[in-house]
């Protein structure tokens, strides 16, 4: 677990996708559209896992509770050779139940974003300049568009040392998706 100290934090962004980059990549909404307006919030201290939950760790939960394994498993066994890769095919409810079993909880979006941006409020965990080679992204040269072992991109860690907050696999948070309060973006969801 990584300790994140209390303090003020700029949640969201005031940036606009003026170049329509997202749309050019086939993403149906402009970057940042649902992350505005930016607001200053004060967050209490919290802890967050250093790495994504691995297949090996998730198997302890499956075995311990007799929970239903993800759909990509063969019975109670995860795919061979994926011990230290982040577990996939896990619903929000599965993730929440795992957290309860582990005596933890899914972080709310504000805490997840704070862990990713650091107290400086970087745009990316490593700073304000996008560097695709620092994370396991599907368009990274040499990428097979598959997850890799957690912590494989140490230079992408946040200032406090949380890994894989960009790329590899998506993470669940404890709140529903929705544009930020005060946003003009209209979501279809």
Regions found by a protein language model. Give the residues of each.
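Short, surface-exposed beta-strand/loop micro-motifs that present aromatic residues
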Residues: 38-40, 49, 159-161
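Well-ordered beta-strand positions in beta-sheet-rich domains
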Residues: 8, 38-40, 45
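Functional-site microenvironments in short loops/helix caps that host divalent-cation chemistry
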Residues: 10, 14-19, 23-30, 68-189
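Terminal peptide-recognition signature
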Residues: 4, 48, 54, 58, ...
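Mature N-terminal segment immediately following signal peptide/propeptide cleavage
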Residues: 1-10
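Short capping motifs at secondary-structure boundaries
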Residues: 46, 53, 59-71, 102-103
